Amino acid sequence: MNKRKAVISLAGYEDIFEDSMENGEREEVVRLPISQFHMFRNHPFRVVDDEKMEETVKSVKQYGILIPGIVRPLNTGGYEVIAGHRRWRACELAGLKEMPVLVRNMTDEEATVIMVDTNIQREDILPSEKAKAYKMKYEAMKHQGSKGEKFTAVGEAAGESGRTVQRYIRLTELIAELLDAVDHKVISMKVGEKLSYLSVEEQGWVWDCVKTSSVQIQDRQAECLKAQSKQGLLYPAMVQDILMKKTRSRGQVTIPEKRIADYFPATYNKQQIEEVIYLLLEQWKKRQEGV
């Protein structure tokens, strides 16, 4: 294989690839045929031929690739792209045959962490992409034996908390239709997280209801579905009943004193009676929601 090597010096290069310095020497950039590139296994991020890609292609035609990608050699031949999938696609569309890259030997876990961290801060990432990426990085860090709070460590590159990372990873438990609904904002992320605790079959019932009735699932409804599922009480008719409930306009409700007087000691004043009523209503509400 013929490789044309060229050392490229870029301003701020060390800031972009902090670990590209080995033994005090700059890592060498090589130009490789893009025909030898392979997509990262289970790559979670889209590479779309959209308006932004058109802008990237124009830049590549005018200036070339200013920031090298990162690849690793494969035992089967060729190179797996770790960072630079969009640049690779832009090269294809621009008619370029080669692309500047850093070639590194690294483990699957190391490659996964770099792949996620170099993509996670993009502005146009879908919830499903971030969910899959965070899960991949979390699993990689577990295999590496990383110490400390892993969820927090996973979110560091994107400036997100460990709790937020957990919520995203939960979304990977959704069936494809519901995950797509989260991406398209038909279902909120908060609702999607709660629905992720339902079984695949139960999620199918939910999707059928959303698809046929165009219902907007509220957080309280999702919480109720989750609670019923946990107790093994959820079935198709109940899903429909929970999701199809509509808020009714209520007028003022007045209960005559004579109707409730016999239920309270004669010594109870109005405030004490109201407190008991509110407590009982709250307990009733929780039973209705299956909490």
Report the location of each language-model feature:
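Short linear clamp-binding motif
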Residues: 1-22, 260-264, 268-285
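Short, charged/polar connector segments at secondary-structure boundaries
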Residues: 1-104, 115-121
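Amphipathic alpha-helical extensions and coiled-coil-like segments
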Residues: 33, 132-139, 162-279
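Amphipathic, charge-rich alpha-helical segments that serve as recognition/docking helices
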Residues: 45, 89-174, 197
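Residue-level marker for well-ordered alpha-helical positions
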Residues: 54, 85, 149, 175-176
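Short polybasic/polar patches that bind polyanions
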Residues: 61, 92, 156, 182-183
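Charged, low-complexity intrinsically disordered regulatory/assembly segments
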Residues: 286-291
